Amino acid sequence: MKLGKHTWTKPQLLLLAAFAAYVWVQLWCVRWYDPWRDVSQAWCIVRDLSIPQIFAQLRYEGHPFLWYALLWPLAKLGLPFESILVLSTALMVGAAAVLVRFAPLPWYAKAACLFSVPFIYYLPTVARSYALAGLLLILCAALYGVRHTRPLRYAAVLFLLCQVHVMLCGFVGFLMAQWALEMLARSVRAKKLAGVDAGALALMAG
């Protein structure tokens, strides 16, 4: 099937339909979900406190500043409490778009991921910082293969992951340690190859 300049295959159309259905389900959940008390707590913090006061409050919370930074302008602009649900849903719709576009999986596996319990309920609907974690984790996976050629992008995603929840710091620390060891191994290998090349040139010159 050809739409505009792009010819769509049947799997692509099925995946597009699955993505559209996923977005519709998320909008339906935003309409009917009744937020829990801790969701309201995060909203009250950004609504009632200044930026310095929020930083002082963080010592009692399990979330670093990033989630509150996203909520703060919504609350200060006078938007209704339900906007936190819209934000959470938008983050996971973005995560779903990255998954659909970049995941090296067959279309039916991607569709199955979209309609899994974490994608449908736990990450977007509960409206906590976990939606932000979902988006950043998928971005991390998408950038993992180019971490050596585009290190700044990969490092930025890892940094943001640390700002989502304290529980993610250990996971990020493991990825950073692995990455550092890989770069060290690449550096040692490059020096050895340079030494071999220099020796070969010396022999040829002699």
Enumerate the predicted regions with their spans.
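Transmembrane signal-anchor helices characteristic of membrane glycosylation enzymes that use polyprenol
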Residues: 10-39, 205-206
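Short acidic/glycine- and proline-prone juxtamembrane loop motifs at membrane-interface regions
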Residues: 125-131
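Short hydrophobic/aromatic helix or loop-helix immediately within or flanking a transmembrane segment
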Residues: 43-47, 51-86, 90
